[in-house]
A protein has these predicted regions:
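Cap/lid segment of the alpha/beta-hydrolase catalytic domain
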Residues: 188-249, 306-315
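Short beta-strand elements
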Residues: 90-110
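Proline/serine/threonine-rich low-complexity linkers at boundaries of modular beta-sandwich domains
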Residues: 1-8
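Gly/Ser-rich "nucleophile elbow"/oxyanion-hole loop immediately N-terminal to the catalytic nucleophile
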Residues: 230-274
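Short beta-strand/loop motif that positions the catalytic acidic residue
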Residues: 348, 354-356
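N-terminal cap/lid segment of alpha/beta-hydrolase-fold proteins
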Residues: 13-17, 127-173
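C-terminal catalytic histidine-bearing segment of alpha/beta-hydrolase fold enzymes
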Residues: 362, 369-409
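Hydrolase active-site cap/lid region
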Residues: 278-328, 383, 391-394
Length: 409
């Protein structure tokens, strides 16, 4: 995160950013330069429910340097967001704040298919029949005194299709807990969770695209604009062809591998991820019961159908301002329900560490709260009101300490 000289500071009039239904919220706006409030600055603003079209919008000059906006209220649980922009030195600067209206009462719109569990059980059984065919390649340049580092890959989903990752194993002989780290969206290589392995756990950080994770950065850049461009939107009209079916199975297979290792202690295996990875962490724990805990930061793929009910849905926002024909959209809604994290979260049976930010417009809080609220297993949540689609280092550290505690370290 970079510090900015010019900031648009937007804050609601409740310190905790929380409101009761029907309670009115005011947003206070100040533009600062080097932390000094600026007068006679032109700003433009919008007030909208989470990811919806604006309810209020205007352009105004801050003659005395301060603006107080009466933003109204909400009558149903959710979020009301104020976004304010100004220009400085030819660059647009934005500030935002998001008021929470009884978010603990948000319920998912996603409908659980009658054959949800049957569908995924069948997929797992088909995958089991494919030989794992493990391949490991030592990466001497990444090894340390305490951890051996390998490029790892196994067969997954179909013959000659593979899932790749970086496996790190403590050098000292013994039995160790395991951590599977699943990725956020995008196409990239991975370094592996070496530090965690040095502290005494087996770690496996995987990619999802069926390509090696040790290639040159230019290869991933080319693929992200080529064959893997907009992969997250592929084939949502056929439940067996959705891009994420192979991905979900790859995560299950990664857990299977970790459980097969002679170094594994046999009882402690956590999954960690953020955004797309936050979704995969929850999904993996439901599809593979050997997972013993989950760290999920702002999970994607959450309550995807929200937009069809007039509220925010999760990344990748399949139904936001959709131009699909009615029948196509109906089919995609049906298919998406098999992949929706809200439908998996209802079945979680292991402890969960959850994180979200109110200002997140990638994985909006309406969608992530709809997931958190249906989790019935032991859970704890960290809310960073001002955070957009990121977490501060302190929160990643907090999550890691939670992992260590669950691993008995």
């Amino acid at each position: 995160l970079q510090e900015r000289m010019v900031k648009v500071n937007v804050v609601p009039d409740h310190v905790d950013w929380k409101y009761e239904l029907g309670e009115k919220v005011k947003f206070n706006v100040v533009v600062t330069k080097n932390r000094v409030p600026q007068e006679n600055v032109t700003v433009w603003y919008e007030v909208a429910q989470d990811m919806m079209h604006p309810l209020l919008k205007d352009t105004i000059v801050l003659e005395n340097g301060v603006l107080t906006l009466d933003a109204g209220t909400m009558k149903t649980p959710g979020f009301l967001r104020c976004r304010v922009w100004t220009k400085y030195d030819g660059r647009t600067v934005e500030g935002r704040a998001t008021a929470a209206f009884e978010p603990e009462k948000i319920k998912p719109t996603a409908v659980l298919p009658n054959d949800f569990n049957t569908f995924w059980e069948s997929a797992k059984q088909e995958n089991v029949r494919i030989p794992m065919n493990v391949k490991l390649r030592l990466l001497p340049e990444r090894c340390t005194e305490k951890a051996n580092v390998y490029e790892w890959n196994v067969q997954n989903y179909r013959l000659n299709s593979r899932v790749y990752g970086i496996l790190c194993v403590p050098v000292k002989p013994g039995k160790y807990p395991a951590l599977l780290r699943v990725p956020g969206a995008g196409v990239r290589g991975y370094a592996g969770a070496i530090v965690e392995a040095e502290k005494g756990m087996i770690t496996l950080e995987i990619g999802i695209h069926g390509i090696p994770v040790t290639l040159e950065p230019s290869v991933y850049a080319s693929l992200s604009q080529g064959g893997l461009y907009r992969y997250q939107y592929q084939n949502w009209d056929n439940r067996d062809e959705v891009y994420y079916k192979r991905v979900y199975m790859g995560c299950v297979r990664a857990v299977d591998y970790l459980c097969s290792m002679k170094e594994f202690d046999g009882s402690n295996l956590l999954v960690q991820g953020g955004s797309q990875g936050g979704a995969l962490a929850i999904v993996t724990a439901v599809l593979n019961p050997r997972v013993t805990g989950v760290v999920s930061f702002f999970p994607a793929l959450s309550d995807l159908s929200g937009y069809e009910k007039g509220r925010a849905g999760g990344w990748p926002h399949l139904f936001r301002d959709s131009t699909d024909a009615v029948e196509i959209r109906k089919k995609k809604l049906e298919v998406s329900s098999y992949y929706d994290v809200a439908n998996f979260a209802k079945q979680l049976k292991v402890p969960v560490f959850f994180y979200l930010g109110y200002n997140d417009m990638v994985c909006p809080p309406t969608s992530t709260f709809s997931v958190y609220n249906v989790i019935t297993s032991p859970k704890e949540i960290v809310i960073m009101e001002e955070a957009e689609h990121y977490a501060y280092p302190e929160h990643w550290s907090q999550a890691l300490q939670w992992i260590y505690s669950k691993q008995g370290m």
